[in-house]
Amino acid sequence: MSLLATPMPQAATASSSSSASAAASASGIPITANNNLPFEKDKIWYFSNDQLANSPSRRCGIKGDDELQYRQMTAYLIQEMGQRLQVSQLCINTAIVYMHRFYAFHSFTHFHRNSMASASLFLAAKVEEQPRKLEHVIRAANKCLPPTTEQNYAELAQELVFNENVLLQTLGFDVAIDHPHTHVVRTCQLVKACKDLAQTSYFLASNSLHLTSMCLQYRPTVVACFCIYLACKWSRWEIPQSTEGKHWFYYVDKTVSLDLLKQLTDEFIAIYEKSPARLKSKLNSIKAIAQGASNRTANSKDKPKEDWKITEMMKGYHSNITTPPELLNGNDSRDRDRDRERERERERDPSSLLPPPAMVPQQRRQDGGHQRSSSVSGVPGSSSSSSSSSHKMPNYPGGMPPDAHTDHKSKQPGYNNRMPSSHQRSSSSGLGSSGSGSQRSSSSSSSSSQQPGRPSMPVDYHKSSRGMPPVGVGMPPHGSHKMTSGSKPQQPQQQPVPHPSASNSSASGMSSKDKSQSNKMYPNAPPPYSNSAPQNPLMSRGGYPGASNGSQPPPPAGYGGHRSKSGSTVHGMPPFEQQLPYSQSQSYGHMQQQPVPQSQQQQMPPEASQHSLQSKNSLFSPEWPDIKKEPMSQSQPQPFNGLLPPPAPPGHDYKLNSHPRDKESPKKERLTPTKKDKHRPVMPPVGSGNSSSGSGSSKPMLPPHKKQIPHGGDLLTNPGESGSLKRPNEISGSQYGLNKLDEIDNSNMPREKLRKLDTTTGLPTYPNYEEKHTPLNMSNGIETTPDLVRSLLKESLCPSNASLLKPDALTMPGLKPPAELLEPMPAPATIKKEQGITPMTSLASGPAPMDLEVPTKQAGEIKEESSSKSEKKKKKDKHKHKEKDKSKDKTEKEERKKHKKDKQKDRSGSGGSKDSSLPNEPLKMVIKNPNGSLQAGASAPIKLKISKNKVEPNNYSAAAGLPGAIGYGLPPTTATTTSASIGAAAPVLPPYGAGGGGYSSSGGSSSGGSSKKKHSDRDRDKESKKNKSQDYAKYNGAGGGIFNPLGGAGAAPNMSGGMGAPMSTAVPPSMLLAPTGAVPPSAAGLAPPPMPVYNKK
């Protein structure tokens, strides 16, 4: 189409092009009179007043005031469309400049402003690296404009492409735009301006684009000086001269003088006086903000009028700025007023020109509250995009469906009112997560939402928005579009949900996708998901803000709305990924939110993947395994907040769950999953629950919650647990990781789904996978089709699994490791009650994912309870499941062997980052040491339960085939990761790695060797454990350890080594050091059996 359209601009617009050339010649495009031109090439874009007075529109009979009004209406249409498309404010500003420059050479009578608004935004989105689909741009325009003529989509698309070509030619392909906002922020920092002054200056910079044609007359630095100068006048703030006796603006632009600033101020005030009432109210509100809190309070009267305006400006420019809840409530009257104004404008407008509906719709939507939010999202700050996506996504979720949008709008008022502050906060916070800069932005946004009366726009908010956020934001919105269509159904549900989480989820939905994309861009960016999770106390992942990961809640608390941000950072999950899942989990229902805390890392990523799947499954799926590896290493260090969550992200990378076997093994009945399932859930869940953050192996950093197993109601309480159930596979560490990685890859399902799929899929929850969220439709055999995902999500939301959450659930056969493993490892059941221990215990008692009910009991209490309870439960579980496990193990062993061999090969190639190449069967390590014990230095012995399948030749063959690469090579790799994150533990890991390698090839012998190393390394391990009880995530390296426990004292060290040093790090020194004999049978129940297990091999 572009080819067809390209010639047309010349032919079809012969008159327009001639007029353009005439305008150029008439206006003397190169204007020498202007002193503000930094470079000759820029002269063409700056015009004198005389030249502007003789513009093409004027020559066509349009009055000066009318032309200015058209420019203003077009700018607001672009603003609204940009917010709907969830592009950054930077992108919107660029589109507005394109529009101003275009109409300096063309008449409004030749090119309708609504058409050029779409073309400008379409082009600016590409230029600012936030491309939007033609279809989405057209839909956004149709939503923002009143229904005029029902044009064919093909016609609209061709017209847009044609107009884009005309625009590009008019601009001479000079598409790089410098904005005054950058200079405003920089100058405010230079003069150390107060927050109000900085915010007002920033607003004025946006207003100069929306209300005036200053961008055609003065360079950005001059406009920035004017904005600060006027803000100083309004706020009665005086910027003193420098020590050199020069005015502050001299340091911004040497050509600026006080006279010029006064002239610009007069011009701006004159335009302000002429502007419609709605614009005046907006400026009044800005002025009030500048004048201080007292004025702000008084300004509340104006807020209804300015409501959409300031919020719009703020949304447009600051994602942080969310409409205050009170503003959201008074939308109806304002909407009516705006409708009347729009009618008047239509009457005034020439019949040829469409009314400026763009502005009105904007007002309305903003009034709706969602629109405001979305406009915020439009803000350059990534955070804004998130917030807008939360509000806006629902509006524009598919972005496309007008119905959805309308519905959302209608629901928005009540919806926003219910949880306006938390929702806004979460949305802004989500945005903040998009980038580090965004975080600042989101914190400001959270503060703004907290202080509805006054939009908080920290000076840095622009930076954040302009820096990372645009890309992340822009990208996310785009992703959102794709994903929104998939998640649309969910979003509507979210809207109705009174929970802030619902609102958050919608924000997340949009935001999550953005983040997932952004995450790719910023793999190391702080995880946004946590941001969304903690932001709303309700939303905080398990429904308990503080409980979610222990680590997560505290950071959020500091931020208020941003809490989740810090939490996410702690988790180390990719911000996008995390946010994504989070929002989706919200969509699923608050139930998922409950699990969210634990799944924040796990579930969110899965959700992110789900979103991705919905939007584009293939986008992430191929990369999942690699991504997992990378993110794990990256996130492991990141997560170490002293909280278990940090290691969890690495676990995600491992995606132990993703092994095909897990998929194969029915995980739906989590309680009675196959031995595989039992093993996987047991180890990983525990580790994931409390130790997930502690151990990299434990993949997700699930807050200690009730069992994750119940996908339904209880998930909320112990989302971490559900994560841990799946984690058992992951925790089993590397072996699981290998097997489950495939499965997870196959089913990158949100954690909620995973929980249900847990039975079915096993570790889908871990798919999240820090850096890249592969779509849920991983190719490993788990179906990730949107329908399947939806059904899974629904199931996960169901409280039917609540019973599973109960501690007894841990004892369920499905969760338990094979009988052989159970004998050595009676602890699994105990883990349940060792909630405090759960971080370690959950890893140790891999078989008892249910037991992962990881309450927030203190480590000491948990240790005691866990030791006694875990032993009892383990014994019971062993007897109950021995027979089942044995039969299951036999069949699964063969499958696992195959998968393990393949995976081990891949992993060995991958550099051992995935020690999980060991047997698919989750090595169940029952580590009785609670977090406290880890911290204390491994007071408790480590219990590793290794299913026979794992010990079997399958594992060995895989390990043996790759012993050097996996056993030894991986341990070092893991050790490296561990060393970075764990510190003292790192030294221990390499030896363990060696031991692990040995164990994989020759379980018993290597156990002995590793046991020696254990003793030598115990001190190291103790120190590392003390320092980082959260390193459990590294239990991924526990694969070897598991065998060793079976094999003997060396088991613990081997675990860490075989599983990839992380295990060793995670395992308390005592656990690692304890020889098989040393490991109390009660604690491990593994010491005596380990050797037999190897023999079974």
UniProtKB/Swiss-Prot annotation:
Biased composition (Pro residues): 1087-1097
Composition skew (Basic and acidic residues), residue ranges: 332-350, 652-675, 860-870, 884-895, 1016-1031
Cystines in this chain: none
Record-linked SMART domains: CYCLIN
Pfam families, per the entry: Cyclin_N (PF00134), CycT2-like_C (PF21797)
Domain of life: Eukaryota
Modified-residue entries (Phosphoserine), positions: 916
Annotated localization: Nucleus
Gly residues compositional bias, start-end: 993-1007, 1037-1050
InterPro entries (alphabetical): Cyclin-like_dom (IPR013763), Cyclin-like_sf (IPR036915), Cyclin/Ssn8 (IPR043198), Cyclin_N (IPR006671)
Compositional bias per record (Basic residues), positions renumbered to this chain: 871-883
Keyword Oxidoreductase belongs to the record: no
Gene Ontology CC entries for this record: cyclin/CDK positive transcription elongation factor complex; nucleus; P-TEFb complex; polytene chromosome; polytene chromosome puff; super elongation complex; transcription elongation factor complex
Main location (coarse class): nucleus
Biased composition (Polar residues): 580-591, 609-620
Alphabetical keyword list: Cyclin, Nucleus, Phosphoprotein, Transcription, Transcription regulation
Known role: Regulatory subunit of the cyclin-dependent kinase pair (CDK9/cyclin T) complex, also called positive transcription elongation factor B (P-TEFb), which is proposed to facilitate the transition from abortive to production elongation by phosphorylating the CTD (carboxy-terminal domain) of the large subunit of RNA polymerase II (RNAP II).
Family named by the database record: Belongs to the cyclin family. Cyclin C subfamily.
Protein name: Cyclin-T
Species assigned in the record: Drosophila melanogaster (Fruit fly)
Name of the gene this protein is made from: CycT
